[in-house]
Amino acid sequence: MTAEHLRLEADRERRLPWKKWGPYLSERQWGTVREDYSEGGDAWQYFSHDQARSRAYRWGEDGLAGFSDDQQQLCFALALWNGKDPILKERLFGLTNSEANHGEDVKEYYFYLDSTPTHSYMKYLYKYPQAAFPYSDLVETNRGRGRNEFEYELLDTHVFDEDRYFDVFVEYAKATPEDILIKISVHNRGPETAELHVLPTLWFRNRWSWQGDVERPLLNQIGASGGVIKAVDSGLGERYLYCDGDAPLLFTENETNTERIFGAPSRSPYVKDSINNYLVNGQRDAVNPDKKGTKAAAHYHLSVGPGECQVVRLRLSEVAPTALTPTNGASPFGKGFEEVVLARQKEADEFYASITPDTFDADQANVMRQAVAGMLWSKQFYHYDVDKWLEERGSDPFKASRRAAPRNDRWHHMYNGDVISMPDKWEYPWYAAWDLAFHVLALTLVDPDFGKQQLKLMLRERYMHPNGQIPAYEWNFGDVNPPVHAWATIFTYRLEKAERGEGDKEWLKSSFQKLLLNFTWWVNRKDRSDRNVFEGGFLGLDNIGVFDRSAPLPTGGYLEQADGTAWMALFCENMLEIASELALSDPEYAEMTLKFIEHFYWIASAMTHAGQDTGMWDEEDGFFYDVLRLPDGKAQRLKVRSMVGLLPLCAATVFDGKVIEMYPEIRERASRFLSARPEIRAAIHDPGKPGVANRRLASIMNEAKLRRVLATMLDEKEFLSPFGIRSVSRYHADHPYVFWAGDQEFRVSYLPAESDTGMFGGNSNWRGPIWMPMNALIVRALIQYYLYYGDDLTVECPTGSGRRMNLYQVAGEITRRLSNMFLRDKDGRRPVYGGTEKFQNDPHWRDCLLFYEYFHGDNGAGLGASHQTGWTGVIARMMHLFATIDPEKMLEAGKMGYVDMLAAEKS
């Protein structure tokens, strides 16, 4: 067991709080719903980047390479100034939704290079131009571009020409859970000496301005010579920031500069932007001469030669200066400082070596490690008391005279105040429940406890609606997202069991009870006609459909969604898996297995049995489509070949016979149910038909349908890209689908890159690109089919190639293609970086990896949010899975038997 594993164990057993401090600062608090108190709900305009340096936040904080405690009481981050910018670089810059041609977009280069799960060691890289940062150029040029044009990026502005920039590395190393060493290494990559002001900044989140019962905390300088900032908070206690070298300490308050923001006199001359005004604007009286406040920075003025590196060292600790006196040989920056940093770095190497498959080469190991590091850096303290927020904006739902709230007034029960895995801490600095389910798959690779805690969090009464709905995201908690929580729950349970030798049954039981509420909400709310056909609404695939699926249809009527119904079939299967696992040790759950067996039969048959002309399955095309049901009773398939039609393939789960052997009445009652309804058995895969080792398969598709869908999916002219499965078939490049509603045209074409519409904000595209989470679900399903059919079912992969594979091999081939987006090819290039030569060839860029939101459907280049390691980080789990699974042993033992075998090896 490595040192990091021991720390995880100590934290789990609550002996030492190794996770108390971490990268829990957001990278963008401005422009969020939480900070929006506007009449119309325009969060981007209400609180802008320009205001952020001067205006105190209500619900959280942000910063560069930020670090805080898990309640975000005390925050640390980096500020930089190159002597030319109009403002301090205190936070990342990006464009708002209306400023960019493809929606909101960060315009900086920064990388999450490393992190252990306890954050005992972390490493971050920020690339800072030596020329003035081109704020206005980025805004104006992007604003002038159309949706069919490329985005104007920071490299395009030429500020990195001749390598005139600084590489600023920030490392955190914990000597103890409360003693944190901070090392900032500044490299001048340019040809000439350049100056840089480095301002490590410590501040308290402003709670006192909003809550009258909160005692105001204090930062103050200790001693006349400086070098130490004392932080005192009634809840957190005392902390000390030790600053190496001769750096003056600058103090102000984390209070709004109301004069600048609102044109009203500020309560204090010392405000949030005072340090900026002191340094950039030369206002020497802007900072507090008494050396106290609630925000402070040490000012290091560096002159860095070409190719030179200079280091700034700090230490945030609960250890008082009196305990660091020379009498006991201690010093905040003595020999022990570097020893701790090197030791934690070495322990991080040992930790990742212990989980990295032996078959991985250095590049594969680097991809996996940086994917996980990005997941760990993307943790954020998320604070949002919706009831208080509504009250503060005059929208209290319990008062008759109230302002209308632009959103979330039905979620007034919610109180969020937790560290949560974010999709992207700049572009999506708020949790998204269905994204989170995929995050957990990667996070459990290194920290099963955190993964379990994240899944359970969404089911707690402070999050889940009393009616059973799981919250979507802050822009509209009531939106409908795919029900993947149960899948992530059973998957996590099995992964932990395989890793630790036993699964957490109590966690599984409590999760199951809450998931029952969510399942009931779905059945009651989303099945309009009580025919087990689900409309769904938004369902997370944004612009994939012919219409905006969360809005009323231009034709009237309603849409029966193939993916909505497939999601519910998968939800049934996952709940059946959980109930079956629990029934092995608790007979109370045996009855629940039958409940979900019957639910699955009804839902699965509804997809294929609604009628030859009006059902979702099209026999001629061998594919599933959404069905438009018009007010006059007519129905029409919307023949778009998209991920919508592949999702029914994903609703497949194999079961062994353990529960049936223990409770034979389940088989008897299920058989009676089917015997009385032969039309159901005829419409789906025969659930009574045995597969390998007498296993059973719950699947919407029988073998004939499966083969036809796979033939389309694995056709390189359709869905199979060199880098995974596309979200829309390439067939639509030359054959767009067109639908007319009156004189209004609706068109779906194959768009392999960015969206050409503003639907759902325009900052994502499901009409062609490759999306990692959907590929992960397809891979999961193929493994399920393999465990049932074994080597008896082989298909051409790619279609028409003559190369036949079983379905495990197909899953491995898709995973290989996905992995190849990030790995160097034979020419040393990473497809994810496309034609960006700096990323392809420069030794200071080429091994720094970004895990984008989605990827070009033809060439694999990264698109969308650049740091959505969130669900794209699942590539780490997929790479690991195919490097460690023995398919022959798994086929022989079965899914649960294989998990039990691995568990026996661990115990």
Regions found by a protein language model. Give the residues of each.
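Basic, low-complexity intrinsically disordered segments
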Residues: 64
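Active-site-proximal polar cores
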Residues: 68
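Acidic, mature catalytic/reactive cores of soluble proteins
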Residues: 1-55, 72-74, 81-907
